[in-house]
Amino acid sequence: MAGARGIYGLSGSGIDVESLVKVGMMSEQKKYDRIYKKEVETEWRKEAFADVYSEVNAFRSNMSDMRLSSKTKPMTATSSLSDAVTATANANAGVMSHTVEVTQAASNAYLMTTSGQKVARTNTAAPTSVALKDVAFAGGTMPAGMTSTDTALSFKLSNGTGTTEIKFTAEEVFTKNLTLNDLATRINNARFIGSDGKKSALNITASYDTVSDAFSIVNTQSGTNNKVSLSMDTGASSATYTTALLNNLKLGQVSGGTISAPLSFTISGTTAKLEAAGTNASVKVDGRTYTNLQDNKLQVNGVTYTFKKATPVGTPAQVTIAQDQEKLVENVKKFVEDYNKLLDDLHGRYNNNKYPDYGVLTKEQEAGMSREQVDKWNERAKAGLLYRNDYVRSIISDMRDAVTNRVGSAPGRYNNLASIGITSKDQSGHLKLDETKLRNAIAAEPDAVKQIFSHTDEDDNYSDNGVATRLSERLGKRMESLKSHAGMTADKSDRSELGKLIQEYEKQMSDFKKLMSSFENQLYKKYNAMEEAISRLSTQFGFFSRQ
């Protein structure tokens, strides 16, 4: 017989060595399997806790949102002239109408090839070329005396705060044939060094439109302080060609939906400059004038206005602020749904008992089953992993406590969930919503939901905190405990208690495997010696039988 540790049975002893070794190893294999089953079950339990952590975390995130006034007191803002002014309102805004006059909206510094014109070319032989050499240089050729390393084009670009240089060498212009698109790219990538020594974006963008043969440069920020300024040293060797380039772009200033004639360079000493600035907004809200607004936004008493253009003279916009009751009811409904969903899941895990006849399968047992059979078995074997678990029980208890108790900081009769139509409908703590009662409460006290849900006490007094605040803070603490015990994921290397336990079981299995291998070798040696002894006896018996 061929064995795993040698060849046996040649003596004719009839001993089944393999079977004897296997029987001898059975008790050791059972010991190993007990550790293996503990390790697998701990992995499953860790995975179950990871699911709980994820679900609680998602709900807690929703509770953090529910603390926001935009959730507990959403407001609407409607403008009678939405093409001129729009608005949004937060919970601090009063339910009322506002009169808004826009004298002038803020605008950006904006240069563009003048309407009805196209980019001109100094090289008249190439009237549609986009190459810089044809736009700025006669004949599209390098001037005499200029070398490839010389600066062919150069100007300063400023946004009113920072300045940088845009330049091209003769090699880039005449050998690499850079184009108007490359000019736009170089402007878009421009940076300047600020007073802090760090590079900052100019917030100036440029583009070339091949269809209309037009070039544009715009400062992305509005207001008079934000400019587009192009300047150069008139004494520089590249000044003549740079002037030709910028003049040929035919840049006019865009303002109020119209575009001016091409701007000209103004000369001051040795500097030539072409510049456009944005405009500030000037508005009047409820009779109060606001001037020199750098952008088109203004917040007054919880209302944020956005200005688009001037309102007609004598016809101001009416901006009406109202509470968004439908949105508020929708938010409360979602809270109830989210709460019940999490509570149902936790109750399911807490009350789900084990199947006593289903445990972790050994590798040998799995080998004798189909994949489908193993999956079905494991589905039942995983039941009850968190049955009557203290961590789950604590979360359920905190959730129910948070929604049941009165909010001490809420004035008047609307001071708990029941007062606005949210009550427990059964022993499980499942919530139900009386929508009519909720709407009546909102109508009677617009701040009712906000007071009950989102209040955060300065002294962190639990009884004075709102429901969403209580849930967020209590669940946060429970999540820290879960994290310490089981981690946030199924990863065993997270240094959680269960993660460390899994690693300890794995070490025990590894060490026990070595002991089993040693014990198995001892068994083979034992039966090998037995075979040899029987062989010697057989030889002696044969000798005496022949006498």
Where are these regions (language model features)?
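Short, hydrophobic/aromatic beta-strand segments
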Residues: 111-113, 227-228
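Short, structural beta-strand-to-alpha-helix junction motif
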Residues: 127-143, 147, 151, 173-185, ...
